[in-house]
Design a protein with these regions (language model features):
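Conserved small/polar residues in nucleotide/adenosyl-binding loops
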Residues: 227-234
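ALDH superfamily catalytic-core signature
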Residues: 21-149
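Short glycine/threonine-rich loop-to-helix capping motif typified by GTGT followed
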Residues: 199-210
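Short, well-ordered beta-strand elements within core beta-sheets of diverse protein domains
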Residues: 73-76, 159-169, 190-195
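Short, structured coil segments at secondary-structure junctions
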Residues: 8, 27-28, 211-212
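A common structural junction motif
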Residues: 91-96, 182-186, 215
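Beta-strand->loop->alpha-helix junctions that form or flank phosphate-binding loops
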Residues: 96-102, 193-194, 216-224
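A structured beta-alpha segment of the ubiquitous adenosine-cofactor-binding alpha/beta core
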Residues: 1-9
Length: 235
């Protein structure tokens, strides 16, 4: 049915997996296709940390992270890393210890592919599947990892309330990490940045030139269709 509809359309906008995008490009009609998202969110040392953390939580917990535009990784500059971590924890996110991180690694990605059993599940359920005990009201599972290579399970699109968190020594390092994550599986999709827009104009310019994505967002949740002020004011 999908193939028949494509043949009748004047132009096709296809979002989904590789099969859907390939079908659109093979339809004989003009097509724009975007596959998987692997959205990195950079938190600069000039960012409003409360706004950044609450925006990411609102976005990542919407539909339990099923939206392909939702944040998959958070890259935090070293200067504010401890503050950001403290804020995530205070807002109900759970930081996995090294042993727990390894257990979740083996659950989120199996044989190189996303485990369908975690998609759209609550954080506590994913922890249970992994053999990890967390509070029932946990919002997001966060794994502190170093590698942005595709061999790192946390570097993949996860479509669930599971986040990778990276420490960047400076803004250039953060850009390098974000570029690599997008290359892992997010070309043409979404990238997000939290920064002081007045003092950080040069950084924003560099960011927009280096991120090979269609959606480049600044100081806003990446998956929510409507932004509300409680993202900043949530207590």
């Amino acid at each position: 049915m999908t193939n028949l509809l494509m043949k009748e359309a004047d132009i096709i906008l296809a979002t989904g997996g590789p099969g859907m995008v390939k079908a659109a490009y093979s339809s004989g009609k003009p097509a724009l296709g975007v596959g998987a998202g692997n959205t990195p969110a950079i938190i600069d040392d000039s960012a409003d940390i409360l706004l950044a953390v609450n925006s990411i939580i609102h976005s990542k917990t919407f539909d339990n992270g099923m939206i392909c535009a939702s944040e998959q990784s958070v890259i935090v500059l070293d200067k504010v890393y401890a503050k950001v971590k403290k804020e995530f924890a205070a807002r109900g996110c759970y930081f996995l210890d090294p042993a727990e991180t390894e257990k979740v690694r083996k659950t989120i990605i199996i044989n190189g592919a996303l485990n369908a059993k975690i998609v759209g599940q609550k954080a506590a359920r994913i922890a249970e599947l992994s053999g990890v005990t967390v509070p029932a009201d946990t919002k997001i599972l966060i794994g502190e990892v170093e590698s942005v290579d595709i061999s790192e399970e946390f570097a993949h699109e996860k479509l669930s309330p599971v986040l990778a968190m990276y420490r960047a020594k400076d803004f250039g390092d953060a850009l390098d990490k974000a570029e690599h994550l997008i290359a892992d599986g997010g070309y043409g999709h979404t990238a997000s940045l939290y920064i002081d827009v007045i003092g950080g104009k040069d950084k924003i310019d560099e960011y927009t030139h280096r991120m090979k994505t269609c959606r480049i967002l600044v100081n806003t949740p990446s998956s929510c269709l409507l932004y509300t002020s409680d993202a900043a004011d949530d207590k």
